[in-house]
Amino acid sequence: MSELETLERTLLAEIEAAADEGAIEAVRVGALGKKGSISELLKTLGSMSAEERQTRGARINALKNTVSEAISARKAELKDAAIAERLARETVDISLPVRSSPAERGRIHPISQIVDEITAIFGDMGFSLAEGPDIETDYYNFTALNFPEGHPAREMHDTFFFAPDEKGERKVLRTHTSPVQIRTMEAEQPPIRIIIPGKTYRQDSDATHSPMFHQVEGLVIDRTANVANMRWVLEEFCKAFFEVDQVTMRFRPSFFPFTEPSFEVDIQCDRSGPIVKFGEGKDWMEILGCGMVHPNVLRAGGLDPDEFQGFAWGMGLDRIAMLKYGMPDLRDFFNADVRWMTHYGFRPLDMPTLFGGLSA
């Protein structure tokens, strides 16, 4: 057996026996390093004749390539083995709270939290979630909801209109989530029990108004729905949402094109301090509008008002978030201020449930 064959066998055995990256690195340095065994052999080529150099040089370089490839392969094996061992050894308890590290200090926006809270409440009552497009046609946003041609909401100063299309039709950014009521009635047969959270758009901006804001509406359609049912649903919602045992509500006559009769709902509260307290006090706070679905709206949804009836309500998510959590300025919701989010935001694991507490 030649000297090179013996060296090759020795080095390959050492590579195979290397148990970690440190050991394989030691073999590499001993063979291919500046003073390694193969490097020393390459240095002897200078004293050989041209013919010897050509023959022996090719064999030494072949040995060098073989050893280099074996080292790379062994490194990959050791790396894979280390990863497999680590995966087998490590376990993650997913029930533990998120660790407090910079990457895990994010906050849930109050609007997202409010939507989850409302969904939990109405989901417990048997309601399902419905959604629709933000860009609506004039028909779904106005006509189908019994808005007459001259209604102020159709004016440019109140609604965001798109440029007319090739047919001359102007689409709008929806001014309420009510178009989803029509779309749901067209697609489903009663009984219908839905809530509709979503973004809405109107040309208004101050401390309590924003050009884009959030609403949630509810709709119940069947053969026997009545005002008493509506009152019970809204009272149960307010008790659960504001987390109080009792609420006192008053229903004031009002007007909305899509309901008849229509009401504005106030809830009794205490406004003497910086935070509004519900379930106590002698003050009143308006929180939502509601009413029995107008017969014309039922017809637009493809339902016979002589057979079906229902009730609907709507409220501003931003407004009730401000009331519940004491946020003074609506514009702060959209300013992307990390300090505000740190103060008013919610932890990722603060999942609202009726049993664990909505805002625990």
Swiss-Prot record:
EC number: 6.1.1.20
Gene Ontology biological-process annotations: phenylalanyl-tRNA aminoacylation
Key words of the record: Aminoacyl-tRNA synthetase, ATP-binding, Cytoplasm, Ligase, Magnesium, Metal-binding, Nucleotide-binding, Protein biosynthesis
Residues forming coiled coils: none
GO cellular component, one term: cytoplasm
Keyword Calcium: no
GO MF: ATP binding; magnesium ion binding; phenylalanine-tRNA ligase activity; tRNA binding
Cofactor: Mg(2+)
Compartmental location: Cytoplasm
Binding site for Mg(2+): 260
InterPro entries to which the protein is assigned, alphabetical: aa-tRNA-synth_II, aa-tRNA-synth_II/BPL/LPL, Phe-tRNA-synth_IIc_asu, Phe-tRNA_ligase_II_N, Phe_tRNA_ligase_alpha1_bac, Phenylalanyl-tRNA_Synthase, tRNA-bd_arm
Origin: domain of life: Bacteria
Catalytic activity: tRNA(Phe) + L-phenylalanine + ATP = L-phenylalanyl-tRNA(Phe) + AMP + diphosphate + H(+)
SUPFAM superfamilies: Class II aaRS and biotin synthetases, tRNA-binding arm
Entry's family note: Belongs to the class-II aminoacyl-tRNA synthetase family. Phe-tRNA synthetase alpha subunit type 1 subfamily.
Complex formation: Tetramer of two alpha and two beta subunits.
Record protein name field: Phenylalanine--tRNA ligase alpha subunit
Organism: Sinorhizobium medicae (strain WSM419)
Taxonomic placement: Bacteria, Pseudomonadati, Pseudomonadota, Alphaproteobacteria, Hyphomicrobiales
